[in-house]
Amino acid sequence: MRPGEAESSGAVIAELMREALSNAGILDAVPAMLYGGFAGVGREEERRDLETELYRLEVADEIIVDSDAAIALADAFDGGAGIIVIAGTGSIAYGRGIDGSLARCGGWGTVFGDEGSGAWIGRRALGIVAAAADGRESATALTGAILTAAEVNTVEDLVPWAIAAETTEVAALAPVVIATAAAGDARANALLSLAAEELVVHVRALALRLFGDERASIPVAFSGGLLQKGSLLRKKLEQRTRSAVPGAQIKSVEIIPARGAVRSALRRIRLPSAP
């Protein structure tokens, strides 16, 4: 959710709720609780605005709006201590300490933050292509790959494309960078290594803030489209995490944020824990 868009976001969520209930054959009941994790509500004002709008729309008796990072953390550690790093279109790290305290790192948005994310990688890939065209950098296979992905013919054509592109379109260049790196391009590999370095800085910052020492035993999990198990960026990030955060205990299980929301909701209404 973008700032100031609580009303439109609430309408979309309400419609999705109606569709879900209808598909389940539930036509007249009001859910006891809506526990949702959404992008763009990591700060209190956005969270409160969306929650207020959903109450106005009467989508459930009790409504809890949380961040997408929070429900991913809940699935990764089921209420226990740990740090999760999420990298998709944007990026953020979120964690819970042994004492239950919560902290976030990053997630400042794609304009001046979200380091290591798809949008961040895409923007830098465009810069590399421009630099190679100028002769400021060596030739790279990224040039042809990016031109093909953007469906333009020349580097000059990338200027109007980039100006008009949505953030998700720029982020969609990240898989192109990953594929080019996997094919052996040195510049693409260097960009992915830098992305991994940016992400591991988030882990280390939270390790120090929540656990006091990066050498402490710290459960760490990864989630998001760019950090699927086996991906080149994840491999680089795992390697750097083990080096920079010696106490990191990396979880290899798949993170399902929606399951984290269910677990959190069940704890609130005191029902048996979700599987």
Residue spans for each PLM region:
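ATP-binding/phosphotransfer module of carbohydrate and carboxylate kinases, centering on a glycine-rich
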Residues: 1-32, 55-56, 75-81, 126-275
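FAD-binding subdomain of flavoenzyme oxidoreductases
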Residues: 35
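Phosphate-binding/catalytic loop of phosphoryl-transfer enzymes
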Residues: 41-139, 272
